[in-house]
Structures are given as C-alpha cells and as structure tokens.
C-alpha cells in the first residue's frame, strides 16, 4: 500500500522547529560546543569531535537517501526528489567530509545526543514532506523561486565549506589555541561559516516553498545567529587587536 501524506505530523514537526528557534532567541545562550564548551559540566562524558560529528549528522543523510532510494519514482524526476537531493548533498558533506577534517574540540555527550535527535527528527520531516506531500507543477524547474533558491543554496554551501576550510587552517593538528580568522567573508563578519549555512537553508526554503523548509531555515537562523553573536563576543574579548569594523553575522549591519 503506498504511503500517503499526513499533514498533522508535518505541521507539528514544523511548529516544533519554529518553537525551538524562538526559544533560542528568548534564552539567548550559545550551544556548549567549540569555543563555548567551557560551560559544559566537568562530569559530562566527552566524545572525540570527528566521531561525534559523523554519528550525529549521519541520520539526516541516511533518512533522506533511504527515502529517495525506496520510492518507485525516478531519482532525478520530480522537483521534490531534486530538492531532497540537495538536502542529502549537504549532509553527505557534513557526514563524510566535514567530520573527517574537523579539528574541533571534543563534544559533550549531551550536545551529541541533542544534535543526533535533531538530525533524526528534521531529516524525517524534510524527507517525508518532499517524498510524500510535496506537489509541484511541471513548470517548477523554471519558476523563479526554484532557480533563485537553488542558486542561494549552492552559494551558501560554498561559503560554508570555504569558511570552514579557512578555520581549519588556523589550527595545526592537536592544537587548541585560537587565532583571528582572516580573508573571505571573515573580513566582514566573525561567523562567515554560519552565514554561509544560513544562506544555504534559506535558499533551500525558497526553492522548496514549504512550511517544513521555512521552519528549518528559521531555526537555523536563530541557532547559528546566536552562535555567531557569541563567537563575535568571544573574539572581541580574547583579542585586543580584533578588527573593530567586523560584525558578527551580517556585513556592515550586525
């Protein structure tokens, strides 16, 4: 029996994402990893960064690719499949490339479990909607929302990958010290990698034009925007010669 779309879990999942994003803004605290891992309780177990990132990002990739593989439709036919392919591409990079290259600090078990639960839930929400609920007209590939959205998705992913690469080059293997990032969008903002991912998921939301995608983009903006804000404060506090003209997330504005 073919699986049909059930709107209630889709709307509930989307509302949960939006609520989580709003709560992040209300509480105004950064997630306790990386530069902010000092706030983690000393009794919490830590996982190696590479293993933690691989395992926590893997569910989103497995869920999205699994749903694409099991459906009877052509992989690159309907727009929903192509859009889910973009989602899968992001998590392929996060799971199999970023996780193996990262030189970040160990992650607490609490942060790891939260991130894993998020990737499972959001992966199911986005994949389920695009495979079983999304209905696009035949001309969607020529629609401006799709074209502009895909452009910004690719642009944002490129910025994110490039910025992450620049951050890795600041630290030799085994080092835990911090240096001022220079070049690229880091010339203008402290959270260039965060800005790239925000642009990426906003592009995805535009191309998808769906409630789950916009809820995910909103959550990403809130979560990574908060991280960028506290990263900026961290740099200003640590480095007396930190560029005063550099903003936290949005060039020349914020």
UniProtKB/Swiss-Prot annotation:
<dbReference type="GO" id="GO:0043025">
    <property type="term" value="C:neuronal cell body"/>
</dbReference>
<dbReference type="GO" id="GO:0033218">
    <property type="term" value="F:amide binding"/>
</dbReference>
<keyword id="KW-0560">Oxidoreductase</keyword>
<dbReference type="GO" id="GO:0021854">
    <property type="term" value="P:hypothalamus development"/>
</dbReference>
<dbReference type="GO" id="GO:0070852">
    <property type="term" value="C:cell body fiber"/>
</dbReference>
<dbReference type="GO" id="GO:0006702">
    <property type="term" value="P:androgen biosynthetic process"/>
</dbReference>
<dbReference type="GO" id="GO:0008584">
    <property type="term" value="P:male gonad development"/>
</dbReference>
<dbReference type="GO" id="GO:0018894">
    <property type="term" value="P:dibenzo-p-dioxin metabolic process"/>
</dbReference>
<dbReference type="GO" id="GO:0018963">
    <property type="term" value="P:phthalate metabolic process"/>
</dbReference>
<dbReference type="InterPro" id="IPR039357">
    <property type="entry name" value="SRD5A/TECR"/>
</dbReference>
<keyword id="KW-0521">NADP</keyword>
<dbReference type="GO" id="GO:0030154">
    <property type="term" value="P:cell differentiation"/>
</dbReference>
<feature type="transmembrane region" description="Helical">
    <location>
        <begin position="206"/>
        <end position="226"/>
    </location>
</feature>
<dbReference type="GO" id="GO:0048545">
    <property type="term" value="P:response to steroid hormone"/>
</dbReference>
<dbReference type="GO" id="GO:0003865">
    <property type="term" value="F:3-oxo-5-alpha-steroid 4-dehydrogenase activity"/>
</dbReference>
<dbReference type="GO" id="GO:0005783">
    <property type="term" value="C:endoplasmic reticulum"/>
</dbReference>
<dbReference type="GO" id="GO:0030540">
    <property type="term" value="P:female genitalia development"/>
</dbReference>
<dbReference type="GO" id="GO:0060348">
    <property type="term" value="P:bone development"/>
</dbReference>
<protein>
    <recommendedName>
        <fullName>3-oxo-5-alpha-steroid 4-dehydrogenase 2</fullName>
        <ecNumber>1.3.1.22</ecNumber>
    </recommendedName>
</protein>
<keyword id="KW-0472">Membrane</keyword>
<comment type="similarity">
    <text>Belongs to the steroid 5-alpha reductase family.</text>
</comment>
<keyword id="KW-1133">Transmembrane helix</keyword>
<feature type="transmembrane region" description="Helical">
    <location>
        <begin position="146"/>
        <end position="166"/>
    </location>
</feature>
<dbReference type="InterPro" id="IPR016636">
    <property type="entry name" value="3-oxo-5-alpha-steroid_4-DH"/>
</dbReference>
<dbReference type="GO" id="GO:0006694">
    <property type="term" value="P:steroid biosynthetic process"/>
</dbReference>
<dbReference type="GO" id="GO:0061370">
    <property type="term" value="P:testosterone biosynthetic process"/>
</dbReference>
<dbReference type="GO" id="GO:0005789">
    <property type="term" value="C:endoplasmic reticulum membrane"/>
</dbReference>
<comment type="function">
    <text>Converts testosterone (T) into 5-alpha-dihydrotestosterone (DHT) and progesterone or corticosterone into their corresponding 5-alpha-3-oxosteroids. It plays a central role in sexual differentiation and androgen physiology.</text>
</comment>
<feature type="transmembrane region" description="Helical">
    <location>
        <begin position="72"/>
        <end position="92"/>
    </location>
</feature>
<dbReference type="InterPro" id="IPR001104">
    <property type="entry name" value="3-oxo-5_a-steroid_4-DH_C"/>
</dbReference>
<dbReference type="GO" id="GO:0033574">
    <property type="term" value="P:response to testosterone"/>
</dbReference>
<dbReference type="GO" id="GO:0006706">
    <property type="term" value="P:steroid catabolic process"/>
</dbReference>
<dbReference type="Pfam" id="PF02544">
    <property type="entry name" value="Steroid_dh"/>
</dbReference>
<dbReference type="GO" id="GO:0032354">
    <property type="term" value="P:response to follicle-stimulating hormone"/>
</dbReference>
<keyword id="KW-0221">Differentiation</keyword>
<dbReference type="GO" id="GO:0018879">
    <property type="term" value="P:biphenyl metabolic process"/>
</dbReference>
<dbReference type="GO" id="GO:0030283">
    <property type="term" value="F:testosterone dehydrogenase [NAD(P)+] activity"/>
</dbReference>
<dbReference type="GO" id="GO:0030539">
    <property type="term" value="P:male genitalia development"/>
</dbReference>
<feature type="transmembrane region" description="Helical">
    <location>
        <begin position="8"/>
        <end position="28"/>
    </location>
</feature>
<dbReference type="GO" id="GO:1904614">
    <property type="term" value="P:response to biphenyl"/>
</dbReference>
<dbReference type="GO" id="GO:0009410">
    <property type="term" value="P:response to xenobiotic stimulus"/>
</dbReference>
<dbReference type="GO" id="GO:0031667">
    <property type="term" value="P:response to nutrient levels"/>
</dbReference>
